[in-house]
Amino acid sequence: MKFSQWYTLTAPLLISSLYTVNAANDLRGVASDKSDLYKPDAKGNWKCLGSDKLISFNQVNDDYCDCPDGSDEPGTSACHNGKFFCKNTGYISSYIPSNRVDDTVCDCCDGSDESLIKCPNTCAQKAREYLATLEEHNRLVKNGLKIREQWALESAKKTDEVKARYKEISDSLVAVSAEKTQLSEKVEKMKRSTDLGAEAVLPLDFQDLRVALLSLVDERNEMQERLDILTNLLDELTLLYETDKFDETMKEAILSFEDLKEQEIRRKVSSDDVHNYLESCNNHLSMLTGPSEDITFSSLIKDIKKILNSLVWNIKLSLINFGILSPSASSTPLTDSESYRRFEAAQRDLDAAEENEKSLEKEHTKLMHELEYHHGWDLYRAIKGMETKREIGGYTYKVVFYENVFQDSILLGNFASQEGNVLKYENGQSCWNGPHRSAIVTVECGVENEIVSVLEAQKCEYLIKMKSPAACSPDQLKQSLLNTQNSANENAVNGMEDKESSVDEL
């Protein structure tokens, strides 16, 4: 008789006799801490675990599914939704689907799922492999944590330096603002001084006005140049549309546009500055032309002469600035007086104080934003700017923490936000007939910065996996789940699915 024929005839009898023996002791397929759930009542009946259905206790493990939840057949394959408990002494207790019970395939390492064939006990071997994998995993996490701790210390030190610099700038800003106020009052007082005279400061008023107007003209000319460049780029793209060179030209045009955007714009002068200079000129002209009891024809001629001398001095100064005259040609009688020299020195001090204040305000604002921004990692300042490169699929990918991501020379995105160990980079270069490129970088614990994989999940949207000590956490250290006692402990697992995934993750 063939084995298959013998198995078909004898299996029901053997299984039935086995289940009868187990009925008197622990039920097959039931964890020891669940055995109390499988006790008959005084009448020999038993209630299904997942419903109110009452059956005879003799129907438990009789190879026929009576309960809707399959709880009456923990040790057979009768119920499609049942589950069998593998004790796996020396390894990790687990559950398997009950349709794998007595299918002549050994699923439990202790072989308890197969009653008709002899399964080798592989629990000890699996335990050794598991412990080796667990030890290696924890070693990597610990090494990554050591590096991360160093980065965190560096970041904390840099944060303290930023805070100290912020306080220093704040104190300096207060002092410079007070100094500027004093100098401004001093200069205004000197302008109104009879020793200096309005005719002496009027050229300075005109000089300020001239500089402001020239700055506005320069700004207008620069903007016109930028407009002309952009217009030419668009004209070239229009002419090359639907040609073989369009993609290449498009790339060059975009790079040119990026370079153009990065060029520094000259200092802007607002219309308020021009208005203030005009008002100052008007005030000092009023001082010259206002009614006076002492005005005579002779004094009027002298005043006109002084004004003309001032205008000539202003013109000479302009010619010197343009490199037409030498500085020696700028001397005029107005600069000979001690009062004027003191005024000129005070004006220089005021200009220097104003420039210093603007510089301090700019740095103060930058530091304030830096301190107010909350980053996802406490080691932000230590790793900002760190580059990680790898060639994948013929492209060189570069990830710069908290800055940008590149595919060769193509910008995939600038850093936008962080959620946990996921960094988002957005507003990269535009795809042809598509959106702006973007990248999501998911970082896992590792002993060094490494790009693991790159996937273009959707058009121009890239998913990048990395390893880095930055993503290591003490929570990632795993404890052994081995069942070291000779008793099934279901508390060692949180269900069949959780257990299998926990082991696989190692």
From Swiss-Prot:
GO terms for biological process: N-glycan processing. It is found in: Endoplasmic reticulum. GO terms for molecular function: D-mannose binding; enzyme regulator activity; enzyme-substrate adaptor activity; mannan binding. The keyword Cytoplasm does not apply. Disulfide bonds join C86-C108, C431-C460, C445-C472. Residues 279-474 form the MRH domain. One of its GO terms (cellular component) is endoplasmic reticulum lumen. Residues 172-243, 338-374 form a coiled coil. Changing E73A: Impairs interaction with gls2. Pfam families: PRKCSH-like, PRKCSH_1. A motif (ER retrieval sequence) lies at residues 503-506. The keyword Endoplasmic reticulum applies. Changing Y462F: Impairs N-glycan recognition. Keywords: Coiled coil, Disulfide bond, Endoplasmic reticulum, Signal. Subunit of glucosidase 2, which cleaves sequentially the 2 innermost alpha-1,3-linked glucose residues from the Glc(2)Man(9)GlcNAc(2) oligosaccharide precursor of immature glycoproteins in the endoplasmic reticulum (ER). Specifically required for the cleavage of the final glucose. The subunit beta retains the catalytic subunit alpha in the ER. Heterodimer of a catalytic subunit alpha (gls2) and a subunit beta (gtb1). The N-terminal conserved region (G2B region) is required for the interaction with gls2 and its translocation to the endoplasmic reticulum, whereas the C-terminal conserved region (MRH region) is involved in the recognition of N-glycans bearing from 5 to 9 mannose units. This is Glucosidase 2 subunit beta.
